[in-house]
């Protein structure tokens, strides 16, 4: 309880996790709060806010703060509690913020602690790790077990985290735009590392069928729930690691895919890349496209930004591979690739058609906070990004590298 109190005292906001009233999917918002009377008080911006309605409908909610997840019961605060909460909010955040964001709102929720807080790693930026690969390797931990556990842990906050990051959303949009050039309406597509299915649901609108695979049980479960809520019938979620991808054959029409894709670095977490390439050879039809993006060992915009900030050592972790990355509050191993090294794993059966940086000029996602403050340069930089991302040498100097391969035959 002492740790819980300290975590709340040191935090300006909490993440409140509710369940959708119809979909039952996790719904996460970041809100201001005050801790008082053995619980937490939050003020709603309006009575029709989804998170407010969710909390009142389902009663049970979860509060994430620091490394803790705290189960709570939600109920409307009394008028007397509302008045008291406004006073505490003004003391904590100032009259200006309270007036601007909550002026006139009488909706206040009391979140009563309803069980023991669960400890989990704090969700931080991908590069904010506390361990190194040599120490992880010496621990004897199972590679796939750790990767699956990390993405299980990240699943509930995954969509929220991506949507709050400008560069991440730009990369997702750009990746789908490029992938669309290689899709046909009658394609049977196979996805490696589907996550919660944000890309899956978009792609399913444009192809005959998608078999969406991921190593994480919870990621697959979330996608399954989304499909049910949206009544999407042409997607098959499947728990499967990349190296075992040939096992997806029974779920594909004729045992083959005409398009395979893997976005946002899922293959950086697959240590058996040659085994994956062999499985891909068996499952992708001759003439079919394989489109993927992986983290790069050299990132031009990262190096420039760190140099401007006099942080000359911050780019070094990319140079030593494998490395550790933070996912869902856990450190897991990952391997970044020089574009030529990654492409060499597929040269036996695939023609390399394109290499595109994602992004070349914009910063990597974990430095998005610096970029969003420079609103005056957004448009010209994004125009420049599109102009140079596919041209040498810039196409090999991005945070991620997007590859387009075509199966021989």
Q: Language model features by range: what are they?
A:
Residues 46-117:
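Short, structured beta-strand-loop surface elements
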Residues 196-245:
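Class I SAM-dependent methyltransferase SAM/SAH-binding core
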Residues 274-286:
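A short glycine-rich, Lys/Arg-flanked "PGG" loop and its adjoining helix->strand segment in the class I
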Residues 344, 354-409:
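A C-terminal cap/extension of S-adenosyl-L-methionine-dependent methyltransferases
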Residues 325-341:
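Acceptor-substrate binding/catalytic loop of class I
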Residues 121-184, 198, 202, 290-319:
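Conserved class I S-adenosyl-L-methionine
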Residues 259-272:
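A short SAM/SAH-binding and catalytic strip from SAM-dependent methyltransferases
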């Amino acid at each position: 309880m002492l740790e819980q109190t300290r975590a709340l005292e040191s935090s300006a906001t909490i993440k409140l996790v509710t369940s959708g009233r119809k979909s039952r999917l996790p719904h996460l918002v970041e809100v201001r709060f005050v801790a008082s009377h053995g619980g937490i008080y939050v003020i709603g911006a309006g009575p029709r806010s989804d998170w407010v309605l969710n909390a009142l409908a389902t009663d049970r909610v979860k509060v994430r703060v620091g490394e803790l997840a705290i189960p709570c019961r939600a109920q409307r605060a009394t008028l007397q509690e509302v008045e008291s909460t406004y006073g505490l909010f003004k003391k904590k955040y100032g009259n200006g913020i309270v007036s601007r964001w909550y002026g006139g709102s009488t909706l206040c929720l009391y979140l009563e602690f309803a069980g023991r807080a669960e400890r989990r790693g704090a969700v931080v930026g991908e590069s904010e790790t506390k361990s190194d690969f040599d120490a992880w390797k010496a621990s004897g931990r199972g590679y796939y077990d750790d990767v699956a556990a990390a993405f299980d842990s990240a699943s509930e906050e995954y969509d929220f985290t991506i949507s709050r990051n400008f560069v991440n959303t730009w990369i997702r949009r750009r990746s789908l735009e490029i992938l669309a050039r290689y899709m046909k309406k009658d394609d049977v597509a196979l996805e490696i590392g589907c996550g919660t299915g944000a890309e899956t649901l978009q792609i399913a609108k444009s192809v005959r069928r998608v078999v969406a695979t991921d190593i994480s049980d919870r990621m697959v479960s979330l996608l399954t729930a989304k499909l049910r809520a949206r009544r999407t019938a042409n997607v098959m979620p499947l728990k499967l690691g990349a190296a075992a991808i040939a096992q997806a054959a029974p779920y594909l029409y004729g045992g083959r895919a005409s398009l395979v894709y893997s976005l946002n670095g899922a293959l950086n977490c697959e240590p058996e890349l040659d085994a994956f390439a062999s499985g891909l050879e068996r499952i992708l039809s001759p003439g079919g496209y394989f489109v993927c993006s992986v983290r790069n060992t050299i990132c031009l915009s990262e190096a420039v930004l760190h140099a401007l900030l006099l942080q000359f050592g911050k780019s070094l972790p990319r140079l030593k591979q494998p490395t550790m990355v933070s996912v869902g509050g856990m450190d897991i191993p990952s391997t970044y690739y020089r574009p030529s090294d990654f492409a060499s794993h597929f040269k036996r059966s695939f023609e390399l058609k394109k290499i595109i940086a994602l992004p070349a000029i914009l910063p990597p996602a974990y430095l998005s906070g610096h970029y969003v403050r420079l609103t005056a340069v957004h448009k010209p930089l994004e125009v420049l990004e599109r102009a140079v991302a596919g041209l040498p040498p810039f196409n090999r100097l991005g945070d991620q590298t997007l590859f387009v391969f075509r199966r021989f035959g």
